[in-house]
């Protein structure tokens, strides 16, 4: 079972990235389910169902209303997410990949190892090129850092080269992927990185 955790600030493009990633997982022969997190609603779950209509069974998308800070539900006490994940697997035992999308949060967000095997943290260029230099566990400790919305960098006066270079520096050259989730640019690379990270971790456990 591959469990992917996707986190990042509000509006960074986590939901769009999830929606772009699911078809690639299916094309690669995997059977995904999606669990979204919102504080008070299931808006992201509704959005994923609409956008992936005809691609992913809408019943394989479930929402968690956390009622608390997003990081609490995916790091400090992931009980609600674990319960929803167990429910989904009971209903659909063929699922071999779960994507947990966190609600929007700050740079301290991380995922509990009990919930995610591969942790993807998403920034976007509209937040400014300085964001990687702010560090925070989401930026420095995630398995993969995504810099999303590269298409608007020039319009928000973000030097993409600086942002990418700083990201590699503070992460000590751990994976950084540039994406435009609306066009799909970079999402294939993200998919490959996720599988590489997961397969590497499994090899270490077996070894």
Each language-model region and where it sits:
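Structural signal for conserved beta-strand scaffold positions within catalytic alpha/beta enzyme cores
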Residues: 63-65, 121, 178
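G-domain G4 guanine-recognition motif of GTPases
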Residues: 5, 9, 35-39, 124-125, ...
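Short, glycine/polar-rich helix-capping loops at beta-to-alpha or helix-loop-helix junctions
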Residues: 43-44, 131-135, 159-166
